[in-house]
């Protein structure tokens, strides 16, 4: 998925990141409106209704693909974009999963200035690899333990309950390329899914 004026789905410009996150919030609200119009509660129920031709495209209905948003090095994004990204990220994490929009954030600096209480409250599923201090483990997992991991993929996982210790698989570059090639050969959309256009109200005011 991408913005209408974007060339690629991978974004590094902070202004475009803010626009994309707010666009995803618009997409989320639009999807909830369609679910309400179709009298269903989840994207799975909605798509089944659409596939079985119980929803008329002339009334605005359309098939909803799943969207996964991945933010690599969340701390850098906070430094570049400030808190402009925190509100849309919290909204997406809190509500969007029911309409097929999922979010993964990653950071190597798990401080409380990066992972705020608002962010933590909306990400019940968390993974921690080895960290240097117990306070970092508590910031991620609300529990100690990640500071005692041995590295090399050793990690702790929680969904808001008990901690589970898991061994993460190592995937090298050639394997990543083979996975990408396999995905690219699958039947799918001929072009990326376009997100709604987002207009920054501050730019209009100027």
Residues covered by each model-derived region:
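P-loop NTPase motor-domain active sites and their immediate coupling elements
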Residues: 1-2, 6-206
């Amino acid at each position: 998925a991408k913005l209408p004026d974007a060339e690629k789905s991978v974004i590094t410009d902070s202004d475009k990141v803010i626009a994309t996150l707010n666009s995803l919030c618009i997409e989320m609200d639009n999807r909830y409106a369609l679910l309400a119009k179709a009298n269903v509660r989840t994207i799975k129920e909605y798509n089944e209704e659409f596939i079985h031709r119980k929803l008329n495209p002339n009334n605005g209905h359309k098939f909803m693909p799943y969207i996964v948003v991945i933010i690599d090095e969340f701390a850098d994004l906070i430094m570049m974009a400030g808190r402009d990204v925190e509100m849309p990220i919290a909204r997406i994490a809190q509500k969007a999963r029911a309409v097929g929009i999922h979010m993964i954030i990653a950071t190597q600096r798990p401080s409380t200035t990066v992972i705020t209480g608002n962010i933590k409250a909306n990400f019940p599923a968390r993974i921690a690899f080895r960290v240097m201090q117990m306070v970092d483990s508590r910031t991620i997992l609300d529990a100690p333990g990640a500071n005692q991991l041995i590295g090399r993929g050793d990690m702790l996982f929680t969904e808001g309950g008990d901690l589970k210790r898991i061994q993460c698989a190592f995937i090298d570059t050639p394997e990543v390329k083979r996975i990408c090639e396999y995905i690219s050969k699958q039947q799918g959309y001929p072009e990326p899914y376009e997100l709604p256009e987002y207009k920054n109200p501050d730019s209009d005011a100027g």
